[in-house]
Amino acid sequence: RRQRQMCIRDRGKTLAYLLPLLLTLKTDDGSVQVLILVPSRELALQIDSVFKAMGTSWKTCCCYGGHPIAEEKKSILGNHPAIIIGTPGRITDHLSKGNFNPETIHTLIIDEFDKSLEFGFHDEMAEIITQLPGLKKRMLLSATDAEEIPQFTGLNRTVKLNFLPDASEEQES
């Protein structure tokens, strides 16, 4: 089975990365296996909602500013989520406090990468990546073709997937 690095663009992407993600989760692990970074609380909650609507038994934890970090820590330590969804600033806080083991994370997804850069999360995302020694797969999702994608991640043969044709392509048809 050949693994590829990819960059997904445009809309309709949440299920496109959540469904295959289920195949990578180890059932008897009990540790955080996947980290999904997002630029906003709203997107974190939306992704969590989509994941819960899928009806899996996997647990998630949303971590974002404006929410009590003590409650998030309690959820992480008590519920043993396989997936943590959060903003870069809050994830950095949890890592600095040792609230979860970053060594068990094998997949990193950065959703709305372009927005995360726009909101100034470059340094936090770069720092988080350095703390994930077991990382095997990275996925960046972006509505725009940000120049920083290959340079930021070290991805060298990205696969770009467009879920909807550009307006110019529609007019040509």
Predicted regions and their residues:
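Conserved phosphate-coupling serine/threonine residues in phosphotransfer and NTP-handling enzymes
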Residues: R9-R11, S40, T87, S142
